[in-house]
Amino acid sequence: MKPYQRQFIEFALNKQVLKFGEFTLKSGRKSPYFFNAGLFNTGRDLALLGRFYAEALVDSGIEFDLLFGPAYKGIPIATTTAVALAEHHDKDLPYCFNRKEAKDHGEGGCLVGSALQGRVMLVDDVITAGTAIRESMEIIQAHGATLAGVLISLDRQERGRGEISAIQEVERDYGCKVISIITLKDLIAYLEEKPDMAEHLAAVRAYREEFGV
């Protein structure tokens, strides 16, 4: 685990974005941890979040021309990541996002920001069922652009309804790499360093045994 990944876990714990305990997911599964990126909700939170996303992008080595944030949660992520890349990595890249409903007046269309072209890096909070990615792919392809990759905050590394995860489905269906700031494996490595969190470590390991990919 790299220093920025450990710092991100601590940031998420601090903001109660990441919690350990017993939680029922939308799928009905009982999970020993819960991640709610919506709780990164202040100016400072967003500034820090952008730095973590930018760090993960630079670390990945994936080449891309533009950041795309799917409405709605991807919008502030794309914005703050673009700022962080420019301020901390000297990479001044364009970004854009979609509207849920296309405007029929003013500038019109369903996109806001830069022209959607070239190699697109899609940024979002998490991938649950992959629906937002599929909707975004239709927009990206309609504009003649290509998907360079997807970056999310957390990869739960667990099976969907079948034998593979929603993330593996996206990689298979679109031939692109999905990267994340942290993974379930990183969470376990972090818990292993914390003797006072041993009960959570046992629960997360058991969960990975049952649902992991």
Swiss-Prot record:
The keyword Glycosyltransferase applies. It catalyses: orotidine 5'-phosphate + diphosphate = orotate + 5-phospho-alpha-D-ribose 1-diphosphate. 5-phospho-alpha-D-ribose 1-diphosphate binds at residues 26, 72-73, 99-100, 103, 105, 124-132. GO terms for molecular function: magnesium ion binding; orotate phosphoribosyltransferase activity. Its EC number is 2.4.2.10. GO terms for cellular component: cytoplasm. Pathway: Pyrimidine metabolism; UMP biosynthesis via de novo pathway; UMP from orotate: step 1/2. InterPro entries: OPRT (IPR023031), Or_phspho_trans_dom (IPR004467), PRibTrfase_dom (IPR000836), PRTase-like (IPR029057). It comes from the Bacteria. GO terms for biological process: 'de novo' pyrimidine nucleobase biosynthetic process; 'de novo' UMP biosynthetic process; pyrimidine ribonucleoside biosynthetic process. The keyword Cell membrane does not apply. It holds the Pfam family Pribosyltran. Its cofactor is Mg(2+). Orotate binds at F34, F35, T128, R156. Keywords: Glycosyltransferase, Magnesium, Pyrimidine biosynthesis, Transferase. Homodimer. NCBIfam families: pyrE (TIGR00336). Belongs to the purine/pyrimidine phosphoribosyltransferase family. PyrE subfamily. Catalyzes the transfer of a ribosyl phosphate group from 5-phosphoribose 1-diphosphate to orotate, leading to the formation of orotidine monophosphate (OMP). This is Orotate phosphoribosyltransferase. It comes from Salmonella agona (strain SL483).
